[in-house]
């Protein structure tokens, strides 16, 4: 603003002289005006360039806040050394490396992760979240799918339950606000069972093994991994699986769309270069 005012002042003064001074003064006026305008344009360009540089620096310094579940093996869990590991954890790391963004991941639990994203305390979550139309309609925005999984039922190893018919009058366990909960809820009236809700899978599994509930519903690869690796004392009941759905990275705030776009681009790259298959094989064989 000060530069423009100066240009106007110089121009007005010179024009006043030209009225009395003839053609030489007119030439001087034109030269002065052109030079001042050039200075103003250069200053504006410098300011714009500085703003772009500042914005770029801010973007490069940004650390995205990502949340995940606490115990959803093999997708996220804490190993014997206390380190957070799993398919989700490694996929996110590979994508961030491919796309060149920084992030911090916090293992806070399924319910807490949902709440953190909805409250704006986290930018996104990766926690084996199935992509559904219902979740999309409630405000969630998903990446492309990165893993297909279905849900099924498991019982204690010594149980004689062989299907849904054996659940009548009994209680089954599910994880709150999960696809497995939706699956069980869709069957409970038909087969006459009650539902008990848990915050995490390990606690739910212990309820089955301990006899507090007759069965549990959970994502099939999660139960299979836990049964195989921890001698859990459960078995998956054949013929109880539903149709598979894709897991996706999720955000709740549309202003974070950049994060989803980077996830999608990176996912495509790590599938193409073999890194994705390497990660999955590490945990599922």
Predicted regions located by residue number:
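A ligand-binding cleft/hinge motif common to bilobed small-molecule-binding domains
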Residues: 129-137, 185-186, 209, 214-243
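Acidic, polar ligand-binding/catalytic clefts
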Residues: 93, 102-166, 234-235, 240-241
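C-terminal motif of bacterial Sec signal peptides marking the signal peptidase cleavage site
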Residues: 15-19
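Short helix-initiation/N-cap motifs at beta->coil->alpha
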Residues: 89, 104-116, 159, 195-210
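Periplasmic-binding protein-like
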Residues: 70, 147-155, 224, 228-265, ...
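Extended ligand-binding regions for polar small-molecule ligands
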Residues: 89-98, 158-161, 171, 176-179, ...
